[in-house]
Amino acid sequence: MQGFVLLISGPSGAGKSTLLKKLFDEFEDELYFSISSTTRKPREGEKNGIHYHFISHEEFQKGIDSDHFLEWARVHENFYGTSLKHTQNALDNGKIVVFDIDVQGFKIARKKMADKIVSVFITTKNKDELKKRLIKRNTDTIIQLEKRLQNASDEMKELSEYDYLIINDELKQSYEALRAILIAHKFRTKGQNLGQIQNIWNEGE
């Protein structure tokens, strides 16, 4: 099987990380999580090389100049980017590469490898629910919270650009939807070596 990209977007606080953790718990051997590089400072509990590659603005700019990134974007005054080389190596090894990136990054990545991307937008049932989750998380100032909500409203305008939409209201139901999307795309003819399969089939005559 040829690898493909499972690209996840959605507002901060929509529950993407929780759903992806469940996905990796079940499909660990088949998945490769693309670890983004970022210029923001680590949050409590985050480790370099596990959650993100934390780099300086100067290092990030060098990556842009050398075409190191498959996609990159500026989010909340910081930069985030995904390594093109690491992504391609994982795809060549038949892995399902998981991206958790914003709408800006999705549009850039799609231009470079549209035929390999399956895109899913995950959000809450409404803006009030998202606000409750962000307040409960208690990691943002009031100004940061309002900016996240505005960014979420802007991203919601891009829903039609994505292949699938999951309203993450009930965790179990949302996970089953994400799981079904992954499984279905594993068996697409588009991603398989049909010539080899046909040869093996004919040899069995």
From Swiss-Prot:
It catalyses: GMP + ATP = GDP + ADP. It comes from the Bacteria. PROSITE patterns: GUANYLATE_KINASE_1, GUANYLATE_KINASE_2. GO terms for cellular component: cytosol. It is found in: Cytoplasm. SMART domains: GuKc. GO terms for molecular function: ATP binding; guanylate kinase activity. ATP binds at residues 10-17. It holds the Pfam family Guanylate_kin. Keywords: ATP-binding, Cytoplasm, Kinase, Nucleotide-binding, Transferase. Its EC number is 2.7.4.8. Residues 3-183 form the Guanylate kinase-like domain. Essential for recycling GMP and indirectly, cGMP. Belongs to the guanylate kinase family. This is Guanylate kinase. It comes from Campylobacter jejuni (strain RM1221). The lineage of its organism: Bacteria, Pseudomonadati, Campylobacterota, Epsilonproteobacteria, Campylobacterales. The gene is gmk.
